[in-house]
Each structure stands twice: as structure tokens, then as C-alpha cells.
UniProtKB/Swiss-Prot annotation:
Signal peptide: none annotated. It is found in: Cytoplasm. This is Shikimate kinase. Catalyzes the specific phosphorylation of the 3-hydroxyl group of shikimic acid using ATP as a cosubstrate. It comes from Staphylococcus aureus (strain MRSA252). It catalyses: shikimate + ATP = 3-phosphoshikimate + ADP + H(+). Belongs to the shikimate kinase family. Mg(2+) binds at residue 19. The keyword Amino-acid biosynthesis applies. The gene is aroK. GO terms for cellular component: cytosol.
Length: 174
């Protein structure tokens, strides 16, 4: 990646396809890709649920921001965790980034994808109403910083890929 260029940063609620789409686009275009959650797990040798359990959510959010800052100048595409916008400091940092792409999805589909997933501490053992409340609490923040929004339940991976490819070409960065 040319370090004068801004990465594509995928934001959105858990289960909307950020990691899947980010990896797909990176593979198709021979770009570098980092999934922040995977990066954290590799770097700290703990799973996300273990970090939540041992240290709490705020500690995890601090790690998330540290890792985002480490990756911002080295990755072409970054998939963030769904709650990355919870911290005011991270939110303000992201507001200053150029290529923020919001992947959104219908809450019923999200619920079917992540219900009782032990790797998602903010989703495990939650009712659809509890998950929807969390989702609704984040929508305005996603919307405020997103350059572009894609509804991943209405578009296929390849359709989102071609839309992102058009954005990449239009920005003439890669």
C-alpha cells in the first residue's frame, strides 16, 4: 500500500459481512487485508471472549483502538469490530478517515448469523430484542462517519465487490 493513501475501513454491526467482504475484495485485487479482531487475537494470544471475560469490554476497546492505529498505515482494507464506534476517541479518529464503508444488514438476518455464537461476547445469549437494541444504539454513529453504505442482505458479495471496485478506481488510490 502507498502510505499516502487511505485504507478502506469496513464498519457495521457484527454479522454484516465485514470480514468476508474485506477478504474477498483484498484477494480479488491483491490488496492487503486486516481483520482487527483477528489481529487482536493473534497479537495478544487471547480470544475476544477471553479478553472480555478477563479484562472487560473497555479494556478490549482500548486494544481495538491501539491495533487500528497500528494497522491504519499498513493495510489496504481493514475490517473493524462492530462496536469499534462505541469509544468517543475511536469514533473521532474514524471521522477523520476518508474511506469508511458501512455494511448494514437486516437485524433478523444478523440474528440468524450470530445467535449464540460464543465468539461474539456482545451477542452470546442475547434475545433478538436485546440485539436489536444494541444495533439501534449504533446506527447513528455508523451513519455519521460512513462515506458509503451497502446493505449486505440486498446485494451479493460480488455486487458489493464491484461497487467497492468502482470506489477504489474513482479514488485512484490503488
Amino acid at each position: 500500500m502507498n502510505h499516502d493513501k487511505s485504507p478502506i475501513i469496513l464498519i457495521g454491526f457484527m454479522g454484516t459481512g465485514k470480514s468476508t467482504i474485506g477478504k474477498y475484495v483484498a484477494d480479488e485485487q491483491n490488496l492487503s487485508f486486516i481483520d482487527i479482531d483477528s489481529y487482536i487475537e493473534e497479537k495478544y494470544k487471547l480470544t475476544i471472549p477471553e479478553i472480555f471475560s478477563k479484562h472487560g469490554e473497555q479494556y478490549f476497546r482500548n486494544l481495538e483502538f491501539t491495533c487500528l492505529q497500528e494497522c491504519i498505515n499498513t493495510a489496504d482494507i481493514i475490517a473493524t469490530g462492530g462496536g469499534i464506534i462505541e469509544s468517543e476517541e475511536v469514533f473521532n479518529f474514524l471521522k477523520n478517515q476518508k474511506n469508511i464503508i458501512w455494511l448494514d444488514c437486516n437485524i433478523d438476518i444478523i440474528y440468524s448469523r450470530i445467535n449464540d455464537d460464543p465468539h461474539r461476547p456482545n451477542a452470546n445469549n442475547k434475545t433478538i430484542k436485546q440485539l436489536n437494541d444494541l444495533y439501534c444504539s449504533r446506527i447513528l454513529r455508523y451513519n455519521e462517519i460512513a462515506f458509503k453504505k451497502f446493505d449486505s442482505h440486498l446485494l451479493s458479495i460480488s455486487e458489493i465487490y464491484y461497487e467497492l471496485l468502482n470506489l477504489i478506481k474513482a479514488s485512484d488510490q490503488y
